[in-house]
C-alpha cells in the first residue's frame, strides 16, 4: 500500500465558477434568451431608416416589403 501526501484528482475545464458542464446545462436557456433579444431588437428598430437601408432591405423576404411605392406627387417635401 503506497502512501500519498496529497489528493490526486484533476479539475475540469472551467472559467471562474463557470464549468463546461454548467455551460451545457444552460445552453438551451441562453439560446432562447439570445433569440428573444434579437427578435426584440428587430421589432424596435424596424421603423428606423438607417436600419432599413443597411440591414432589413438586404433580407430576401423582407426587403421588397420595405420599398416605397408612393408616387412622387404624394410625397411631402
From Swiss-Prot:
<keyword id="KW-0813">Transport</keyword>
<feature type="transmembrane region" description="Helical">
    <location>
        <begin position="22"/>
        <end position="45"/>
    </location>
</feature>
<dbReference type="GO" id="GO:0045275">
    <property type="term" value="C:respiratory chain complex III"/>
</dbReference>
<dbReference type="GO" id="GO:0009060">
    <property type="term" value="P:aerobic respiration"/>
</dbReference>
<dbReference type="GO" id="GO:0006122">
    <property type="term" value="P:mitochondrial electron transport, ubiquinol to cytochrome c"/>
</dbReference>
<dbReference type="GO" id="GO:0005743">
    <property type="term" value="C:mitochondrial inner membrane"/>
</dbReference>
<dbReference type="GO" id="GO:0045333">
    <property type="term" value="P:cellular respiration"/>
</dbReference>
<comment type="function">
    <text>Component of the ubiquinol-cytochrome c oxidoreductase, a multisubunit transmembrane complex that is part of the mitochondrial electron transport chain which drives oxidative phosphorylation.</text>
</comment>
<keyword id="KW-0472">Membrane</keyword>
<keyword id="KW-1133">Transmembrane helix</keyword>
<keyword id="KW-0812">Transmembrane</keyword>
<keyword id="KW-0249">Electron transport</keyword>
<keyword id="KW-0496">Mitochondrion</keyword>
<dbReference type="Pfam" id="PF09796">
    <property type="entry name" value="QCR10"/>
</dbReference>
<protein>
    <recommendedName>
        <fullName>Cytochrome b-c1 complex subunit 10, mitochondrial</fullName>
    </recommendedName>
</protein>
<feature type="topological domain" description="Mitochondrial matrix">
    <location>
        <begin position="2"/>
        <end position="21"/>
    </location>
</feature>
<dbReference type="GO" id="GO:1902600">
    <property type="term" value="P:proton transmembrane transport"/>
</dbReference>
<dbReference type="InterPro" id="IPR019182">
    <property type="entry name" value="Cytochrome_b-c1_su10_fun"/>
</dbReference>
<keyword id="KW-0679">Respiratory chain</keyword>
<dbReference type="GO" id="GO:0005739">
    <property type="term" value="C:mitochondrion"/>
</dbReference>
<comment type="similarity">
    <text>Belongs to the UQCR11/QCR10 family.</text>
</comment>
<comment type="subunit">
    <text>Component of the ubiquinol-cytochrome c oxidoreductase (cytochrome b-c1 complex, complex III, CIII), a multisubunit enzyme composed of 10 subunits. The complex is composed of 3 respiratory subunits cytochrome b (COB), cytochrome c1 (CYT1) and Rieske protein (RIP1), 2 core protein subunits COR1 and QCR2, and 5 low-molecular weight protein subunits QCR6, QCR7, QCR8, QCR9 and QCR10.</text>
</comment>
<keyword id="KW-0999">Mitochondrion inner membrane</keyword>
<feature type="topological domain" description="Mitochondrial intermembrane">
    <location>
        <begin position="46"/>
        <end position="77"/>
    </location>
</feature>
Amino acid at each position: 500500500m503506497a502512501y500519498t501526501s496529497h489528493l490526486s484528482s484533476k479539475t475540469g475545464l472551467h472559467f471562474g465558477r463557470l464549468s463546461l458542464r454548467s455551460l451545457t446545462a444552460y445552453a438551451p436557456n441562453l439560446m432562447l434568451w439570445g433569440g428573444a433579444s434579437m427578435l426584440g431588437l428587430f421589432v424596435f428598430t424596424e421603423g428606423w431608416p438607417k436600419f432599413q437601408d443597411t440591414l432589413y432591405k438586404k433580407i430576401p423576404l423582407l426587403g421588397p416589403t420595405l420599398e416605397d411605392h408612393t408616387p412622387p406627387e404624394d410625397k411631402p417635401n
